[in-house]
């Protein structure tokens, strides 16, 4: 998939989800398998034991981990694609590059990782 194809296909799904969030930083993570969305995650500001186990400084859950928890166990290990979106209140792209902790474990479980920044979609 090209970057343009990813934007055209998945942005219409991610943008309304992001814009509906009441948080200032509206991160949405989509996990894709065979061009289908199999999991959606968002930043969650409540404690979860996986966040501390993976080495996060706080117990808040990032959108990548929230989405990955929803992936069926039968698909873990397959060629999954992670796409992170973040939009400002005007609907423009903002930086949603995975933090260093997310980047480390995501690099081990995802075949490809994409994220938005002020210039559009980038590949990690």
Identify the function of each model-found stretch:
Residues 26-39:
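Short beta-strand scaffold segments in enzyme catalytic cores
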